[in-house]
Amino acid sequence: MENMKIQRAMRFYLLATKLKYKIRTGWDQNHWNISSERIESVAEHVYGTCILAIALSSEFDIDVDLNKVLKMLVIHEISEVLIGDITPFDNITPQEKEELEHQAIISIIGDLATKGELIALMLEFDEHQTKESIFAYHCDKLEADIQSKVYQDMGYHHSLDEQENNVVFKSSKVQRMLDEGAETAFDIWYEYDKGIYTGDEPFVKALRYIKDNNTKI
């Protein structure tokens, strides 16, 4: 019995931590083609979302169950171990992506004793209905926006006229932003995502701060 417990725990750990070696697709040569020799991994993104959740809940005294939020954030990307990091621009519908993610997460969780809790957290996160899931979702999106600005400030983003292979530019929404005067990669990230945070002041303020300030500290 004890051996089975250890086996289940180690299987989950060894599978889930493969995210350390999965690169965030949005930064690859088919998307923003970040010029840094080392590109952010999915695990680093997950870590960033957790730090962001701790920081914002602390400074703004946000009424959420932080432990629940952190579990959601840790769990929500582990499907990418099996299916990779699928972006909104990768020719797959949101419904298809969600189904693939759910199947992958269930497979990775396996027979952990907390299987039911973890699957429930995954579903709650995806529905974006509870205060914890909305907060976690906003942390997930904002962390990516911040990373885009970090790359911008470090000089790792290419100019907008060097994006001939970027699938993001096939989006009519992105083309409209270019027509309206977007000058940098982060301009597009900012305009694309800012509406997500409408009415959620800590996130509105955080995104604006990142936009207006250099992230090099």
Locate the predicted segments by residue:
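Alpha-helical, largely C-terminal catalytic domains
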Residues: 1-217
